[in-house]
Design a protein with these regions (language model features):
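ATP-dependent helicase/translocase motor core
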Residues: 1-63, 68-229, 238, 242-253, ...
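Short, hydrophobic beta-strand segments that form beta-sheet elements in well-ordered domains
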Residues: 93, 256-259, 325
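A glycine-rich phosphate-binding loop feature that marks nucleotide/adenosyl-phosphate handling sites
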Residues: 188-193, 234-235, 262-266
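Conserved helicase ATPase motor motifs in RecA-like P-loop NTPase domains
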Residues: 190-191, 327-331
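Conserved helicase motor
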Residues: 237, 258-267, 279-285
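Walker B catalytic acidic pair
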Residues: 279, 326-327
Length: 336
C-alpha cells in the first residue's frame, strides 16, 4: 500500500480504537502545516514542514505521528517524527508504517516499539504527570486553569490569520507558567517575530476566562469572576499606539490608552477598563516638584510620598493582574 492507503486502512483505525476522535475533547489534526517553508534567495520558499497527524486533547497539542507506507521500515519516519516534535515542542512523538508503532519521548529520550498509541487521557497524564493524581495540589489547580485556557480558541480574525508555530509555543508556555502561578516570565524574540501578536493572544485567553490574581490563587475554589486588569508598558508612544490598535478585537470599553494630557485634565490616572496601554515615561511622571527633596531627605515617610506622587503610584499595589513589558535593550536601565 502507498502512504495514503496505509493511513486510511491501518493507522486511522488504530487511532480510533485508542479513543482518538472518539473520546470527548480529543481531536486528530491531519496534514498539519508546521511551517510554510524558509524563504530563500529570490523569494522562493523551501519545502514546508507538514505533520501527518497531530493529536490534540482538551485543546492542547500533545503528540505528532509521522506515517510511512507499510512497505517501508517503521524506522524510516523516526528522524522526521523527532524533527516535528522538536519544532512543536511536544514531549511525545510516533513513527508508524501501519504494522508497527515506534514511540519516542523527547523529554527522557526513551524510545522503542509499542503495541498501541496512548489514549487521550494517558497521553495527557504523561505530559502533565501530576494532573491525574486526584489531590487538590498546586498541580491539580494548574491543570484546571490549563483546561480553561485551552478551551478559549485563539482569535484568528474570522479565520483569516493564524499564529506561527513558535508564536503558539510562546503563548502556550506563558499560559502554562501563569497556570502554575509563576510571577515573572521572560519571552525573548527577534524583531519582527510578532511579539505584540503573542501578547494579544495571552491577554485574550486571560480576558475570556476571567482569570485574575485572586482567581489564580483560588484555583478550584470560588473566586471573584472579574475580567483581569492588564497593563501593557512600552518605551515609545508609537509602540504603545500600535499595541492599542492591535488589540481592537477586544470590546472598545475594555481598552484604555493612558496619556499625560488626560491625567492632567482629570487629576488622576484612569481605572475604568481592563487593558491599559502606556509608556514608562508617562508612568514615571510626577506633577509635584518634590522628588529631589525626597531623594535627599531619605526618610521613610518621604519615600512613601515620593512613590505616590508618580503616576504609577496612584494605582494600589497589585492593581494590575498582569503587566506586559515591551522590552527594549536600549531602555534596560528604565525597566530595572
Amino acid at each position: 500500500m502507498n502512504e495514503a492507503e496505509t493511513r486510511a486502512e491501518l493507522i486511522d483505525p488504530k487511532l480510533k480504537s485508542c479513543g482518538w476522535g472518539i473520546v470527548e475533547g480529543s481531536k486528530i489534526l491531519r496534514e498539519y502545516n508546521i511551517t510554510a517553508g524558509k524563504i530563500q534567495t529570490g523569494g522562493i520558499r523551501a519545502k514546508k514542514l507538514t505533520a501527518d497527524y497531530v493529536l490534540v486533547y482538551k485543546g492542547i497539542k500533545l503528540a505528532v505521528i509521522e506515517a510511512k507506507s507499510d512497505d517501508l521500515e517503521v524506522g524510516e519516519g523516526v528522524a522526521q517524527a523527532k524533527q516535528y516534535a522538536e519544532k512543536l515542542q511536544l514531549e511525545t512523538t510516533y513513527s508508524s508504517n501501519g504494522k508497527e508503532i515506534y514511540s519516542i519521548c523527547m523529554k527522557t529520550g526513551a524510545e522503542g516499539l509499542v503495541d498501541d498509541y496512548l489514549t487521550p487521557e494517558e497521553l495527557w497524564n504523561k505530559t502533565y504527570p501530576a494532573a491525574g493524581s486526584g489531590n487538590n495540589t498546586v498541580a491539580e489547580l494548574a491543570d484546571a486553569w490549563r483546561v480553561k485556557f485551552a478551551d478559549v480558541p485563539y482569535e484568528d480574525k474570522s479565520g483569516t490569520w493564524q499564529l506561527r508555530y513558535y508564536q503558539e509555543i510562546a503563548v502556550r508556555n506563558t499560559i502554562e507558567a501563569i497556570a502554575n502561578k509563576q510571577q515573572r516570565i521572560l519571552l525573548t524574540l527577534a524583531t519582527g517575530t510578532g511579539k505584540t501578536a503573542i501578547a494579544f493572544q495571552i491577554a485574550w485567553k486571560l480576558f475570556q476566562t476571567r482569570w485574575n490574581l485572586s482567581a489564580g490563587q483560588a484555583g478550584l475554589k470560588p473566586y471573584v469572576a472579574r475580567r483581569p486588569r492588564i497593563l501593557f508598558l512600552a518605551d515609545r508612544n508609537i509602540l504603545a499606539d500600535q499595541a492599542y490598535n492591535a488589540f481592537s478585537a477586544f470590546p472598545e470599553d475594555a481598552l484604555v490608552r493612558i496619556n499625560p494630557k488626560e491625567i492632567r485634565k482629570d487629576g488622576r490616572v484612569p481605572t475604568n477598563g481592563s487593558i491599559f496601554f502606556t509608556i514608562f515615561q508617562t508612568f514615571m511622571t510626577t506633577s509635584k516638584k518634590i522628588v529631589e527633596e525626597f531623594k535627599e531627605a531619605r526618610l521613610a515617610e518621604a519615600a512613601e510620598a515620593s512613590y505616590t506622587s508618580y503616576n504609577f503610584g496612584q494605582y494600589p499595589p497589585d492593581y494590575f493582574d498582569l503587566i506586559i513589558i515591551e522590552h527594549s535593550s536600549a531602555y534596560a536601565h528604565t525597566i530595572r
